[in-house]
Amino acid sequence: MDQAEYFHSWCRQDEMMLNLLEKCPTQQIQRLPLPIRRLEKKQEIQKMLEARREDYHKAMEGVAREWEKLQEKEAEIRVGLEKYKKSIVKNDKKQERAFRDAAKARSMCIQYDLQLKALQEQCEELDKKRAKTKAQVQKYEKCHRYLEKVVKASEKFQSIPELMSQFHALVSYLPQEEQEEQKSQESRSQRIHCMEEKSDSIVQFSNEIHRLYIRLEKAKKKRREWELRWNQMLKTATRKNLLLGTIKAAVRDIFQTVISQGLGSNSVGEDDIVEQLEIIRKDIEDLTDIWEKLSLNEELMEPIRAPLLPTDKTLGHPPSQ
C-alpha cells in the first residue's frame, strides 16, 4: 500500500470503526454490561488511533529524510555542474592557446623555409660568380702567355716595360678576385652555419608541434569524459526529480482529502508541500484532542447514568455517540 491509499484509509476510520463494532459477537455483548462494552470499544478505538498515529509519524519521518537527501543530492549536483563548467572553459582556453601556438609554429616554419630558399639562391649565385671569376682568371693567364708570344713575334710590343705594364695591369686585378673568393668562402660558411641553425630550429618546432598535438588529443579525451559525467548527472537528476514529484503528488492527494472533509484551509498553494504537511499534522492533532475530550466527557458521565440492560434494539448494534 502506498502513502496515498494509507491516508485515504486513515481518513475513513469512522466507517471502519462502525464495521468493527458491528462484527462483535452478539453473545459477548449480551454477557457484558453496556458501560464495560463501551469502555472496551473505546480502548480498541484508542489502540487503533495510536497505531495509526505511529504509522503516520513514521511515514512523515521517512518523507522528511527523503526530502533532506534530495536537497543534499541537488546541492552536490549543482557543485558538480559549476566545476564542470569551469573545467570546460579552462579546456577551451587551453585548446585555443594550443591552436594559436601551432599556427604560430607553422607560420615560423614557412618563414624559415622561405629564408632557406633565399639563402640557397644566393649561394647558387655566388657559385656562378666564382665559376665565372675562375674562368676569367684562366682566360687572362692564357692571354698573358699568348701576349708574350705576341710580343716576341709582333712588332707592336718592342720593350719589356710595355710587357710589365701589361703584366701589372693584369696583377692589379688579382686582389679583387681574391677578395671575391674570400667573400664567397665566408658566404658559404655562413650559409652552412645558417642551414644548421635552421635545421635545429625546424626539429625543435616539429617536436613542439607533436607535443601540442598530444596535448590536444588529451584535452579532447578529457572533454569526452566530462560529457559522459554530465549525461550521468542529468540522468540522476531526472530520476530524483521523478521521485520528488511522486512524493509531492502523494502529499497533495492527502491534503486534498483533508480539505474535502473540511478539516483544513484551502489557502495554501499547490506547490507548498511543507505547509500542506503542517496543516495535515495540525488537523490530526485537533482531531485527536477532540476525541480525547469526548472520551473524557464520556468517562465523567458514565458513573451518573444507570447501567442499561441490553434490549432487542441494542443487540448487535453499538450505541450512538
Swiss-Prot record:
UniProt key word Coiled coil = yes
Annotated Gene Ontology cellular component terms:
cytoskeleton
Coiled-coil segments: 36-144, 202-229
Q: Per the record's keyword annotation, is Cytoplasm included, yes or no? A: no
The name this protein carries in UniProt is: Coiled-coil domain-containing protein 42-like 1
Recite the UniProt keywords alphabetically.
Answer: Coiled coil
For this protein's source organism, the top of the classification is: Eukaryota, Metazoa, Chordata, Craniata, Vertebrata
InterPro entries from the UniProt entry: CFAP_domain-containing, DUF4200
* Highest taxon in the source lineage: Eukaryota
Q: Which Pfam family, any one of them, does this sequence belong to?
A: DUF4200
**Family according to the record:** Belongs to the CFAP73 family.
